[in-house]
Amino acid sequence: MKSDIHPKYAAVVFNDLASGTKFLTKSTVSSSKTIEWEDGNTYPVIDVEISSESHPFYTGKQRIMDSAGRVERFNARFKGFGGKK
């Protein structure tokens, strides 16, 4: 087995920019930006734009597209288009 080929796996804090929530977890990603966590230790911080805390699928605030109405409007608008002459 080759040594020193795997990335470093360490604790990091993910900061959700949309909701302001922070998660402490382990990852191979690193950052020069750090934060002091609730336990008093300092960890690298990774800013993410969206996470499970702010994504509409997980929060239950998703919008449902009215695709049936759109199809009906399209068919009504182009009903006679492309017919035989």
Swiss-Prot record:
Belongs to the bacterial ribosomal protein bL31 family. Type B subfamily. GO terms for cellular component: ribonucleoprotein complex; ribosome. GO terms for biological process: translation. One of its GO terms (molecular function) is structural constituent of ribosome. Part of the 50S ribosomal subunit. This is Large ribosomal subunit protein bL31B. It comes from Pseudarthrobacter chlorophenolicus (strain ATCC 700700 / DSM 12829 / CIP 107037 / JCM 12360 / KCTC 9906 / NCIMB 13794 / A6) (Arthrobacter chlorophenolicus). Pfam families: Ribosomal_L31. InterPro entries: Ribosomal_bL28/bL31-like_sf, Ribosomal_bL31, Ribosomal_bL31_B, Ribosomal_bL31_sf. Keywords: Ribonucleoprotein, Ribosomal protein. PROSITE patterns: RIBOSOMAL_L31. The gene is rpmE2.
